[in-house]
Amino acid sequence: MESVAAESSPALENEHFQETPESNNSVYTSFMKSHRCYDLIPTSSKLVVFDTSLQVKKAFFALVTNGVRAAPLWDSKKQSFVGMLTITDFINILHRYYKSALVQIYELEEHKIETWREVYLQDSFKPLVCISPNASLFDAVSSLIRNKIHRLPVIDPESGNTLYILTHKRILKFLKLFITEFPKPEFMSKSLQELQIGTYANIAMVRTTTPVYVALGIFVQHRVSALPVVDEKGRVVDIYSKFDVINLAAEKTYNNLDVSVTKALQHRSHYFEGVLKCYLHETLETIINRLVEAEVHRLVVVDEHDVVKGIVSLSDILQALVLTGGEKKP
């Protein structure tokens, strides 16, 4: 189990940062270094844990039932946490084993989690990336970005218990609670174009008519968490995210992946408010406010005709705020 150790931190309560042009750009970095993961853990939260001997199908249904996106995996034989089961696993299973709407996906119906892990990882078992509650939030952000993961279990080193799952979204929301107390860094007033935050080359997208199975292949190949859905002119009309895929389990429609992404997205049409977008000329402050208020994981960057130009994710934002002080990532 690969855990991030705690650093010795300054006082953890509200800091009095010196307001100088030099220090302003690192004000969020200082904040993250002076707060521990423990500070972010709510007094009450839902945590679902799966034993690796559980059937894969039951595990995914349990994710849906409990309204969570991932769960730590407990290996009874090793008496330790060995990994995470996420929607990405569901996508990988469907993509690997789906044949046609007429053939049942035996591996999804019958495999245990441990069987799937053996097949999928094929002896390339990586230790579970986790973090101590006493480690700084700066360490947590660094670990999320360095390991290219979206969920970081907070595990008590003494008891071995999982206390919470840290995500980019939860960390940014926590930072936003205190953001008005700090002097505003200069880069917050700069535009996306000036800061070059986000991804603007080789954007993975799908058409409205793209079959779900093809979309799953793009998720697997490009390792992205969402795909803008575009019309024939390249204008964004919808977005198909990994989280939408778990609905196939909720509706038990995972045996027919030949339907279009448009049809697969009909389940949420009654409350879907449209794709959340932004423009290159908008400031970083505006972008952060939009992301936090809408509680989404990314914004689609478009031009004045709604043609997709790029994607800005929570990971991009945290990297800019905390690790690079508004500078373009190396």
Curated annotation (Swiss-Prot):
Q: Which residues bind AMP 1?
A: 84-89, 129, 150-151
Indicate which residues the UniProt annotation says bind AMP 3. Answer: 150, 199, 204, 225-226, 297, 313-316
Modified residue annotations for Phosphothreonine: 262
Q: Identify the SMART domains for this entry.
A: CBS
> Taxonomically, which superkingdom?
Eukaryota
- Positions of ADP 1 binding: 84-89, 129, 150-151
Segments of this protein annotated with the region Disordered? 1-21
Q: Which InterPro entries match?
A: AMPK_gamma/SDS23_families, CBS_dom, CBS_dom_sf
Note the PANTHER family from the entry.
5'-AMP-ACTIVATED PROTEIN KINASE SUBUNIT GAMMA-1 (PTHR13780:SF38), AMP-ACTIVATED PROTEIN KINASE, GAMMA REGULATORY SUBUNIT (PTHR13780)
Q: Could you tell me what this protein does?
A: AMP/ATP-binding subunit of AMP-activated protein kinase (AMPK), an energy sensor protein kinase that plays a key role in regulating cellular energy metabolism. In response to reduction of intracellular ATP levels, AMPK activates energy-producing pathways and inhibits energy-consuming processes: inhibits protein, carbohydrate and lipid biosynthesis, as well as cell growth and proliferation. AMPK acts via direct phosphorylation of metabolic enzymes, and by longer-term effects via phosphorylation of transcription regulators.
Q: What is the name listed in the Swiss-Prot or TrEMBL entry for this protein?
A: 5'-AMP-activated protein kinase subunit gamma-1
Q: Which organism is it from?
A: Mus musculus
UniProt lists the gene as: Prkag1
